[in-house]
């Protein structure tokens, strides 16, 4: 299948069908391809531009090959009725902004507000510090078996799902990704392949061209509610420096709109005010936010946490969700959730 796919994508610049994409990725994850073929596939897709069908087909193959995380108190009860939302804040990364790990801080705040969070993430591929790097620097043991991750989610209310542990077949892709050192379709697939089958998400993307595309992919993959976001300054989060483009998945359709910080009583700040560093620097920034320090960094986390609370159904609007997120920080609940996470994962 990989040879046919390469001819179609690289030679003829034709799109794959959803089924062809699924079969191609299954071959990749089955170890049936070479590093050169994987590299050609990734570059060819990047040059052609990935379609929604291709993205969905790839995601379906990765989901099928993943180690499932069985959560007893999951998003659905035995009758199939929605009970507790299960949220992920995993984004695409790859925005080259140099900011601290906003989506990881957001996950802790939202967990502090009482939402169950299955934070999917990995080590850095193209940035200084990936979500796995900063979570580890915060004291969390990320190398847990799936059963312990599920238990952590049930008992603590938040778990970090370390992608290499859940997607072991991705070992076939990593050499090509490391050598390419560029954004590829796998940046898009991380947020679409949560092993706990998260029912709601906030997904930051590195270009505005992907906002609606990723929202349509999430819709096809069965997400109940999601917000896909991209800041005007290039941030793959809701930004504090100006407008943010949003595509919201809700009630079986996608709605696009734009938001700005001042709509929610927050002041704009330059992107430089969100600058981070390595894992230790970013961990210190997150601790300061959870300690209640006022800054643009706190404000950008409030914005993103508000979006996550809306996605999880805990608030109808972001305006109503901002005070909920602020209380989770100022009451110490978010900090307490991190403490419990560190304690549980190091037992």
From Swiss-Prot:
The keyword Transcription regulation does not apply. It is an enzyme of class 2 (transferase). One of its GO terms (cellular component) is cytosol. Anthranilate 2 binds at residue 177. Anthranilate 1 binds at residues 91, 122. Binds 2 magnesium ions per monomer. SUPFAM superfamilies: Nucleoside phosphorylase/phosphoribosyltransferase catalytic domain (SSF52418), Nucleoside phosphorylase/phosphoribosyltransferase N-terminal domain (SSF47648). It catalyses: N-(5-phospho-beta-D-ribosyl)anthranilate + diphosphate = 5-phospho-alpha-D-ribose 1-diphosphate + anthranilate. Its EC number is 2.4.2.18. Pfam families: Glycos_trans_3N, Glycos_transf_3. 5-phospho-alpha-D-ribose 1-diphosphate binds at residues 91, 94-95, 99, 101-104, 119-127, 131. Mg(2+) 2 binds at residues 236-237. Coiled coil: none annotated. One of its GO terms (molecular function) is magnesium ion binding. Homodimer. Belongs to the anthranilate phosphoribosyltransferase family. This is Anthranilate phosphoribosyltransferase. It comes from Koribacter versatilis (strain Ellin345).
